[in-house]
Amino acid sequence: MKHFKNKKILVTGGAGFIGSHLTKRLVSVGAKVSVIVKYNSIIDCPRLLSIWDKINVIEADLRNVDSVYAIKKLKFDYIFHFAAYNHVGDSFTHVSESINSNLFSTINLLDHGPKYKKFIHIGSSEIYGLQKKLPF
C-alpha cells in the first residue's frame, strides 16, 4: 500500500462497508483521497467520521450524466469503483434500479468522468450467479 502515498485517488461508494475500509487505509498511507457520495446527509456516516477532515467529499450521483460532468475536470492516479446497488437479493425484483446503479453509473464514469491513470472496478461473487462449482 505504500505506493499509494501522495497519489490522487477517487473512491466511489467510499461510504459503503468495503469502500470505507479502503478509504481509511489509503488515508493512513498518505494518499490524497476523494470520495464520491450520493447524498449530502453522508456527513453523519460513522464509517468515515474519523477521517472526515482528511478526505475530499464529492456529492455526485453517477447515474446522472450531468452529475458526472461536474467532476470531469478532476484528475486522479487511481479510481476505485465500489459504487453499486447493494441489495443483492432485491436486484432480481428491482432490475432497472440495479442496472442503473451498476451498469449505467459505470459507463457514465468511464465515458464522461474524470481523467485517471488506472481504473479498478470492484465486483463480488454475486456476478457468478448460482453455480454448482465455484469458478475460483
Q: Would you name each region that the model predicts?
A:
Residues 1-136:
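N-terminal Rossmann-like NAD(P)+-binding domain of SDR-like oxidoreductases, especially those catalyzing
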